[in-house]
Amino acid sequence: MSPGRIVTVVAAVALIGAGLVFALTRGDDSGGPDGASGDAIVVDMVVSPEKERLLAPLVDEINGGGVEAAGRPVRVEMAVVSSGEATERIVAGEIEPAIWSPASSLWGRLLNYRADRALAPDESPSLVKTPLVIAMPEPFARALGWPDEPIGWSTLIAEARSERGWAAYGHPEWGPFKFGQTNPEFSTSGLSATVAEYLAAAGKREGLTLADVRAPKNRRVVRDLQRSVVHYGDTTLFFAEQMAARGPTYVSAVAME
């Protein structure tokens, strides 16, 4: 058993719609993508960074394929913007894409909440689905009973609340339980992890409501887990690099894509 080996111990959120496509509703009478450059109808499209290589060839194909609407050529202009940043800029009116492809459907719901109006539809097609998981150093996972015993969010919450930390499992040298997740304001994995934490606190697997988030009991549970966060990284790659460089005691578990 290598102390440096990282294992996936639990699916945090079953699937993230990483290829989601939203056709955004405009607040004016434009009715859609009709910004003109010369004679062309320009369709402004914003995509999250992980899909740039997937969608760029499709954009080139459309732009070079002679697509027309109402007798005018159509040109797609694609901008690459992280989902969290795009959410903020759309709400602020800094960008008005006709098409938005964030890293998760959660961003569309958050956009509508922050804008206080339905800019993104409730249902949109998803091109790709990827899991969000909890990763742990293998010795830590085995100390919790993995793989014979399942490790879930309730396990992590209990460990975060424990005053004894890893000493309760015969490993005081590992120190307290330390959790890692990315910033939910900007990162998809961080946002998804926070939603999963509230679902666990509410005793649900899906169907999180605003009442669940506002419930004092659930907020206390999530707060206790968040207090164990060692660092809010910008990306999950940061945690992977730190775990490799600093060893297993840097963090006990990380929510990762």
Task: Write out the residue ranges for each language-model feature.
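Extracytoplasmic/periplasmic solute-binding protein
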Residues: 170-202
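Short, low-complexity patches enriched in S/T/P/G
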Residues: 1-7
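Helix-boundary/low-complexity linker signature
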Residues: 1, 25-26, 36-39
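Ligand-binding pocket segment of bilobal, Venus flytrap-like solute-binding proteins
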Residues: 196-257
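Polar helix-capping/helix-linker motif
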Residues: 162, 187, 212-216
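N-terminal segment of the mature folded domain
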Residues: 31-175, 183-186
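Hydrophobic alpha-helical membrane-insertion segments, chiefly the h-region
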Residues: 7-9, 13-25
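A short secondary-structure junction signal
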Residues: 146-147, 190-195, 208-209
